[in-house]
Structure formats: structure tokens, C-alpha cells
Amino acid sequence: MEAKAIARHIRVTPMKARRVVNLIRGKQANEALAILKFAPQAASEPVFKVLQSAVANARVLADRDSVAFDEGDLFISEAFVDEGPTMKRFQPRAQGRAYRIRKRTSHITVVVATPASEEDR
């Protein structure tokens, strides 16, 4: 069983969000939540929320399909960060010049799954 959660237009640069996502890729869901809870990076908060949402989505899918479900079995099968739209702003500088400020956004996707068979556990 797979469950997915996506957060779009998150106001964190994709490069910084990828650093955090790389920490949790392939780990158990509860272990990844613990890592994100204590990670010092600011991007860990939106990634934490997306992972929580994916786990909740898995719980809803299991209830809907009447499948036996244990949150301890969930692992992160996919996690990636795509670049969202960039807001462009100008910073006034001396002598009529202006510097461009690029406020980047991210789309964060996390997919959690249960192992397909007993050998995968």
C-alpha cells in the first residue's frame, strides 16, 4: 500500500529542502519523523508536516480498504523536491541601480509504503 502527500509553493529554496529530504529518504516513517523533529534546518518543518500528512493518508487508505495497518511498517519509498515558481523582487541600490532578489519556492513530495512481502521487513 502506498500513500502520497505533496506540499506546493513552500517558501524555502529547493536546494535547502533537498538537504533535509536526503536525510530521510529510505528510512522508516517514525524514525524519519524523529530525525526531522530535531533537525536544525528551517526546511525540516515543512518536510515534517508533509511526512505526517503522508502517514495520515496511509491510515485513511487502510481504513477505507479495510486493510490491517501498522504505522511501524511504513517506510519512505520516495521523497523528492521540485522547484516551484520564483517570485522576483528588486532591492534598490545606489545611483538608481537595483539588484534582483529571487524568492524561490519548492514543491515537496513524500510517498510512504508498506513492505510488499515479509522478506522486505
Curated annotation (Swiss-Prot):
<dbReference type="InterPro" id="IPR001063">
    <property type="entry name" value="Ribosomal_uL22"/>
</dbReference>
<comment type="similarity">
    <text>Belongs to the universal ribosomal protein uL22 family.</text>
</comment>
<comment type="function">
    <text>This protein binds specifically to 23S rRNA; its binding is stimulated by other ribosomal proteins, e.g. L4, L17, and L20. It is important during the early stages of 50S assembly. It makes multiple contacts with different domains of the 23S rRNA in the assembled 50S subunit and ribosome.</text>
</comment>
<dbReference type="InterPro" id="IPR018260">
    <property type="entry name" value="Ribosomal_uL22_CS"/>
</dbReference>
<dbReference type="GO" id="GO:0022625">
    <property type="term" value="C:cytosolic large ribosomal subunit"/>
</dbReference>
<keyword id="KW-0694">RNA-binding</keyword>
<keyword id="KW-0689">Ribosomal protein</keyword>
<comment type="function">
    <text>The globular domain of the protein is located near the polypeptide exit tunnel on the outside of the subunit, while an extended beta-hairpin is found that lines the wall of the exit tunnel in the center of the 70S ribosome.</text>
</comment>
<keyword id="KW-0699">rRNA-binding</keyword>
<keyword id="KW-0687">Ribonucleoprotein</keyword>
<dbReference type="GO" id="GO:0019843">
    <property type="term" value="F:rRNA binding"/>
</dbReference>
<dbReference type="GO" id="GO:0006412">
    <property type="term" value="P:translation"/>
</dbReference>
<dbReference type="InterPro" id="IPR036394">
    <property type="entry name" value="Ribosomal_uL22_sf"/>
</dbReference>
<protein>
    <recommendedName>
        <fullName>Large ribosomal subunit protein uL22</fullName>
    </recommendedName>
</protein>
<dbReference type="GO" id="GO:0003735">
    <property type="term" value="F:structural constituent of ribosome"/>
</dbReference>
<dbReference type="InterPro" id="IPR047867">
    <property type="entry name" value="Ribosomal_uL22_bac/org-type"/>
</dbReference>
<dbReference type="InterPro" id="IPR005727">
    <property type="entry name" value="Ribosomal_uL22_bac/chlpt-type"/>
</dbReference>
<dbReference type="Pfam" id="PF00237">
    <property type="entry name" value="Ribosomal_L22"/>
</dbReference>
<comment type="subunit">
    <text>Part of the 50S ribosomal subunit.</text>
</comment>
